[in-house]
Amino acid sequence: MEPSATPGPQMGVPTEGRERSPEPPDYEDEFLRYLWRDYLYPKQYEWVLIAAYVAVFFVALVGNTLVCLAVWRNHHMRTVTNYFIVNLSLADVLVTAICLPASLLVDITESWLFGHALCKVIPYLQAVSVSVAVLTLSFIALDRWYAICHPLLFKSTARRARGSILGIWAVSLAVMVPQAAVMECSSVLPELANRTRLFSVCDERWADDLYPKIYHSCFFIVTYLAPLGLMAMAYFQIFRKLWGRQIPGTTSALVRNWKRPSVQLEEQGQGLGAEPQPRARAFLAEVKQMRARRKTAKMLMVVLLVFALCYLPISVLNVLKRVFGMFRQASDREAVYACFTFSHWLVYANSAANPIIYNFLSGKFREQFKAAFSCCLPGLGPCVSLKVPSPRSSASHKSLSLQSRCSVSKASEHVLLTSVTTVLP
C-alpha cells in the first residue's frame, strides 16, 4: 500500500521536531473582508440614508394603516373618494412592506441579496404598485370631474367604486407581467458566486437593445406623462368650477339668492322661534356642500402634486438610462449613485406623505388619527372611540342650535349671512 499523500503524521515516522508547513492564505476570504470593510460597509452619509428610509418605513406603514381603519370603522366616511384613497393606501402599504427593505439594501450594498425568485417578484410588485397608484389617482380625478363639472352625466356609487378598484388591480397585475419576465439575477464576479451573494445584480435582460427602449418609453408615457396631463386638465376645470365667479359660490351671489327667502319670511309674519324656510335650509346646505367640495378638491390636488414631484426624478432617470443609454460610462460615479439613491427614496417618501396630507387637509381624517393616537399614547389625552356620532344626531344638534338663534326673520337672515361668510373660504 502506497503511503498517503495527505499531510500529517504517518505510521512509523516520528513527528517530534518536525515543523508543519504553513497553510496557504485564503486570498478570497481576505478579498471579501477588504470589500466589506472598505467598500460595502455604510459610509457616514449612507447612515443618514438608512435613517431616512427607516423613518419613511414606519410613517408609511402606520399612517396608511390608520387611513384604512378610519374608513373601515366609520360608515359616514365610506364615500367613493375615500374608497379610492383606501386603495391608494393599500398599494402604499404593499410597496413599503415588501419593496422598501430590498431597495435599501441594494442602494447600500450595491448587491442583490435575495436570490433569483425574489429578483422577479419584488420589481414586479413595485411596478404593480406604481400602476395601481396612477390608476387610482386617475379614477379619483375622473370621479371628481363628473361630480362637480358634469353631475348629470354620470352618478358614482360605492358599488361602482369597488368594481373600479378590482379592475385597477387586475389591469395592473396583467400589464406588469413583462417586468417580471425580463428580470434576471447574475453575479459580477462569477468566481465568487458560490461563496457569497455580494456583487450579484438583479437587472433586466432583453433579447434585443431595441425592446427596452420601446418598453420604457411606453411605461413613462402610460404611467406618468399621459395620466398626469389628463388629471391636470381635470383639476383645472374643477378649480374653475369651484372657485370661479360665474357660479353661485361667491358671497355676493349667495347674498342675492338669500334676499328672496328672507323677504318671504317677513311677509308670512312668522313669529318667534320659527324655523328657517326650507329654501333657506337648502341654501345653507348648498353652501356647506360647496365648502366641503373645495376642501376635498384642495386635498386631492396636493396629493397629485406630491405624487408628480416624488416620481419625477426616478421617471426621468429611468428614461435616460434605459432609452438613451446614459450612465453606462459615467465619469462621476458618486454623483450618479447619489441621484439614483435619492430618487428611490423619494418614491417611498410619497407613500409616507399621503397620510400626512390627509391629516392636515381633512378634518375627518385628522379626528380619526387623533383618536387612534390618544388610545396608544396616554399623554395626548383621553382615549376616545374611533367612531364619530352619526350624521343624523349631528344634524339634529345643529338644527336645534339654529332654531334657538332664529327668533325673528331679521335675526335669522343675519345668522345665515354670517354663516355664509364664515363657511366659504
Swiss-Prot record:
Q: How does it sit in the membrane?
A: Multi-pass membrane protein
* Location within or outside the cell: Cell membrane
Q: Which residues lie on this side of the membrane: Cytoplasmic?
A: 68-82, 141-160, 236-298, 361-425
Picking any one GO molecular function of the record gives: orexin receptor activity
Disulfide bonding pattern of the chain: C119-C202
Q: What is its main location?
A: membrane
Which intervals of the chain are annotated as region Required for response to orexin-A?
26-41
Q: Name one GO biological process term.
A: feeding behavior
Q: Which PANTHER family does UniProt cross-reference here?
A: G PROTEIN-COUPLED RECEPTOR 15-LIKE, LEUCOKININ RECEPTOR-RELATED
So what does this one do? Moderately selective excitatory receptor for orexin-A and, with a lower affinity, for orexin-B neuropeptide. Triggers an increase in cytoplasmic Ca(2+) levels in response to orexin-A binding.
Domain description: The N-terminal region is required for orexin signaling.
Give the family, as the similarity comment puts it. Belongs to the G-protein coupled receptor 1 family.
The identity of this protein, by name, is: Orexin/Hypocretin receptor type 1
The organism of origin for this protein: Bos taurus (Bovine)
